[in-house]
UniProtKB/Swiss-Prot annotation:
This is tRNA-cytidine(32) 2-sulfurtransferase. It is an enzyme of class 2 (transferase). One of its GO terms (cellular component) is cytoplasm. The thiolation reaction likely consists of two steps: a first activation step by ATP to form an adenylated intermediate of the target base of tRNA, and a second nucleophilic substitution step of the sulfur (S) atom supplied by the hydrosulfide attached to the Fe-S cluster. Transmembrane segments: none annotated. It comes from Syntrophotalea carbinolica (strain DSM 2380 / NBRC 103641 / GraBd1). The gene is ttcA. Its EC number is 2.8.1.-. A motif (PP-loop motif) lies at residues 37-42. GO terms for biological process: tRNA modification. Catalyzes the ATP-dependent 2-thiolation of cytidine in position 32 of tRNA, to form 2-thiocytidine (s(2)C32). The sulfur atoms are provided by the cysteine/cysteine desulfurase (IscS) system. Homodimer. It comes from the Bacteria.
């Protein structure tokens, strides 16, 4: 069925377009691999980018790329059917990540982090093979905010995600066009359009990333009393004032007049 182009659709599309403009995420001639996992975030990103592409003043291509990690029960057939229905160019990459994780994961290491690194490596390889210069990921505003808090609480760094950065391999630019879109809007869009929610089959899914879940609950609780909390936190990432921080690499503390 066609995507419902209602008020919510227009809101997400406008915010995504704003991020693309603010951070120069998409340029003329880009060939973009859109990572599609089968979750609400990646489906929403794919459909919104496609809608923007149809009316954009520049030309760019989208290719949906899925990395099947090899967990039992991961229904890639449902995903393929959805991609065919909407005419998306796609690449379904089947891997043996599940076996590699089982054999190589060190005691005490994060299952989710190791799996993510493996899948990201596959995405880069597939993007190279497809001639894509950019990789689009479905992280939304809440992901940025939660990562900001995680780094402060557990790592001791003032950092979140970047909406645009050069990948470690030096060949691809990673973009996150939904940086301004709240998770609640993504969830509502996915539900309104019946986008298929496809569990990855991960055996650790119920125990995955408890710290992030803790941050998610914290933000939700605080937002009950501070409705603009999320927008304030995402705004803070673009309003850094080094003179009020403690990082000596950003400020010279050697003079008596340091302020």
């Amino acid at each position: 069925m066609p995507i419902v182009e209602d008020r919510l659709f227009r809101k997400i599309k406008k915010l995504t377009g704003k991020a693309i403009g603010d951070f120069n995420l998409i340029e003329e001639g880009d060939r973009i691999a859109v990572a599609v996992s089968g979750g609400k975030d990646s489906w929403t990103l794919l459909h919104i980018l496609d809608s923007l592409r149809r009316r954009a003043p520049i030309r760019y291509e989208l290719i949906a790329v899925n990395v099947d990690p090899g967990f039992p029960g991961y229904r890639t057939d449902i995903m393929e059917a959805h991609l065919r229905e909407y005419g998306f160019a796609n690449r379904m990459e089947r891997t043996d990540c599940a076996t590699i994780i089982k054999e190589k994961l060190r005691p005490g290491s994060s299952f989710c982090a190791f799996c993510a690194r493996l899948r990201r490596g596959v995405l880069y390889s597939v993007a190279t093979e497809l001639g894509c210069n950019k990789l689009a990921l479905g992280h939304h505003l809440d992901d940025f905010v939660e990562t900001l808090l995680l780094n402060q609480f557990y790592v001791g760094t003032l950092a979140a995600m970047s909406p645009k950065l050069l990948a470690d391999n030096g060949q691809h630019t990673v973009i996150r066009p939904m940086v301004y879109v709240e998770e609640s809007d993504v969830a509502a869009f996915a539900e309104a359009n019946g986008l298929p929610a496809i569990p990855c089959g991960c055996p650790e899914e119920t125990r995955s990333d408890q710290n992030r879940q803790r941050m998610k609950r914290l933000v939700s609780q605080l937002a009950e009393d501070i409705p603009h909390l999320r927008s304030s936190l995402i705004g803070a990432l673009g309003n850094v004032q080094p003179r009020h921080l403690l990082d000596a690499s950003l400020k010279d503390f050697g003079t008596a007049a340091a302020d």
